[in-house]
């Protein structure tokens, strides 16, 4: 099955109010659009909250698999969040034909007139739990590795709904998004963590997390 863009979402920072009366500023609830222009730092009309942790060259856009989205819905088992609606996890794109098991770090995809490069998995934060109003959401995403992935922009252009994703390059065919997620949850040994640090295209933010894991190994050893 060819990989395709099923839905595109962009959004601005807004004040969100939750059932417990709490509020915070976030751009997590992105809205569906039919197409979007892509620039060097992301998508036109799109913003992120908590810029210390989101956005930038290595986190320009966030992709999720439709299969993973549906699996998370089943695991959360409280509310159903259709992937064709307003973003639940802050996703910019939901795709078919790709998931954490067949997307690799450094993959380059042509979509419409753009070229994007996979830079790292998404590290789930507490705001996922807050937005779904389910305190287990973050842990479930972390434990299952159904994280989605970030990309950096290689060539700007326009992406439309139903565009196909054409794989142009795969420099690290053994290093899937699932594999990288496992390094942060259940690494086998220090050597495989050291090996990941040698991957040039892996985002520095993710490498910092790997270094933290290495420190834990050294403390245990």
From Swiss-Prot:
Q: List the disulfide bonds.
A: none
An example Gene Ontology biological process: toxin catabolic process
What domain of life is recorded for the organism? Answer: Bacteria
| SUPFAM superfamilies for this protein | PK beta-barrel domain-like
Q: Which InterPro entries match?
A: Benzoxazolinone_Detox_Enz, MoCF_Sase_C, Pyrv_Knase-like_insert_dom_sf
Q: Which residues form the MOSC domain?
A: 30-168
GO molecular-function annotation terms? molybdenum ion binding; oxidoreductase activity; pyridoxal phosphate binding
TM spans (from-to): none
Q: Which Pfam families would you find in this protein's record?
A: MOSC
GO cellular component annotations of the record: cytosol
Q: Which PANTHER family match?
A: PROTEIN YIIM
Protein name (Swiss-Prot/TrEMBL): Uncharacterized protein HI_0278
Organism encoding this protein: Haemophilus influenzae (strain ATCC 51907 / DSM 11121 / KW20 / Rd)
Record lineage: Bacteria, Pseudomonadati, Pseudomonadota, Gammaproteobacteria, Pasteurellales
